[in-house]
């Protein structure tokens, strides 16, 4: 997958041995990319991400920035979210979550990356 380099690969191997053994929701929560709600009183609909494995999330953030440029599938996903006036950080977090769930599925199913043809 474009955007996944040696730094991300080694980080995932070392700090996320559960990759490929969990569901997409579980792996997103484990990394800290699942939004949690803190609704109370007037604060409704505000979601944030927190917790999880910070070193994995930090490296995944930089990989997502690279993938938004060079991975055609994620580039289209990024532009689609930007067209709906999402905030830039929200878009990057969505790309991060898509990357980790895709990598999780690839390891679970033991398949190589196959870019979608246009």
Model-identified regions with their sequence ranges:
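Histidine-centered phosphotransfer motif of kinases
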Residues: 1
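Hydrophobic aliphatic residue packing
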Residues: 4-7, 59, 93-95, 100
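Phosphate-backbone recognition surface of nucleic-acid-processing proteins
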Residues: 6-84, 88, 115
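Basic, amphipathic alpha-helical segments enriched in Lys/Arg and hydrophobic/aromatic residues
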Residues: 83-118
